[in-house]
From Swiss-Prot:
It holds the Pfam family Photo_RC. One of its GO terms (molecular function) is chlorophyll binding. The lineage of its organism: Eukaryota, Sar, Alveolata, Dinophyceae, Gonyaulacales. This is Photosystem II protein D1. The record marks 163 as: Tyrosine radical intermediate.
């Protein structure tokens, strides 16, 4: 049953009651809600600032050594190489709004735009998740929609907020661009060896497994639609929006898949099936976010990066050794100054 908030519920019926009724009404074509009051301005400011910085921003002194890096289209980048450059290492993790700098140019030079975009974006996306919960609550629905959306939210928060805080500087955050994303991935691998971490492995299983399961489910449903029309008419014509009857035969899909693999590999309960489809990728991404958040503080005890030694103390070459050597190479190339050595090579 709809839990609709109407202006008539407010005594006196004044203009404020009309506004509240409009915000909380579930009859609107586009639901706003209390969280929407925060979501729209925060997300809008983040988008406007990102587009402006991607096109126009001057170079940013990301390393804090007076060697600014250009990321905008105006300074010669393209769609692939362009990015919003993270805040300067000289700023660290300090909150750096525009009024903390002497001039706007100084704020831009120190990468204040990055903090502006990231913090407004995280706030806007968090408000979106809260809006999902609020809308579900007012419609009398279960809260699983917002819970599923928490996976990409915690992943973004881990990369843009937790990791820079743990490393001591927003300059370690992920640049907001295509090539910047890959650069962040390579540096993260070099410094933390995330590919050999079990939480990352669970995340990969969640994402790729979720894609596989969704494709399997969609193909099984599409292949077992109940025909309500003649052979020369599309099956879609026989479907009426909101109909109570099922549109496909889950028993046929269950029987097909059970014989294709084995009986217990398929679901005979639609609710269990769809819960599994939602839970698998969400839990995997949760673990990835947890792995990034722990590595942010250099807590890496679960990593499988130890060399294999036999009983005589001789090294048995393994894939872990190859990855470790590759990590050292990436880390050396990442350091742009010869007087800055990677921690692993420092004596």
């Amino acid at each position: 049953m709809k839990n609709t908030y109407r202006a008539s519920n407010i005594s006196g019926f004044n203009w404020w009651g009309t506004v509240i009724g409009f915000i909380l009404s579930t009859s609107n074509r586009f639901y706003i809600g209390w969280f929407g009051i925060f979501m729209f301005p925060l997300t809008g400011l983040a988008i406007i600032a990102y587009v402006a910085a991607f096109i126009l921003a001057p170079p940013v002194d990301i390393d804090g050594i007076r060697e600014p890096v250009a990321g905008s289209l105006l300074y010669g980048n393209n769609i692939i190489s362009g990015a919003v450059i993270p805040s300067s290492n000289a700023i660290g993790v300090h909150f750096y709004p525009e009024w903390e700098s002497a001039t706007l140019l100084e704020w831009l030079y120190n990468g204040g735009t990055y903090q502006f975009v990231v913090l407004h974006f995280i706030g806007g996306v968090s408000s979106w998740m809260g809006r999902e919960w609020e809308f579900s609550f007012r419609l009398g629905m279960r809260p699983w929609i917002y819970l599923a959306f928490s996976a990409p939210l915690v992943a973004a928060t881990a990369v843009f907020v937790f990791y820079p805080i743990g490393q001591g500087s927003f300059s370690d955050g992920m640049p907001l661009g295509v090539s910047g994303t890959f650069n962040f991935m390579l540096v993260f691998q070099a410094e933390h060896n995330i590919l050999m971490h079990p939480f990352h492995i669970l995340g990969v299983a969640g994402v790729f497994g979720g894609s596989l399961f969704s494709a399997m489910h969609g193909s099984l449903v599409t292949s077992s639609l109940l025909a309500e029309t003649s052979g020369d008419v599309s099956l879609n014509v026989g479907y009426n929006f909101g109909q109570e009857d099922e549109t496909y035969s889950i028993s046929a899909a269950h029987g097909y898949f059970g014989r294709l693999i084995f009986q217990y590999a398929s679901f005979n309960n639609s609710r269990s099936l769809h819960f599994f489809l939602a839970a698998w990728p969400v839990i995997g991404i949760w673990f990835t976010a947890l792995g990034v958040s722990t590595m942010a503080f250099n807590l890496n005890g679960l990593n499988f990066n130890q060399s294999i030694i036999d009983s005589n103390g001789h090294l048995i070459n393994s894939w872990a050794d190859l990855v470790n050597r590759a990590n050292l190479g990436i880390e050396v190339m990442h350091e742009r100054n010869t007087h800055h050595y990677p921690l692993d090579l420092g004596l």
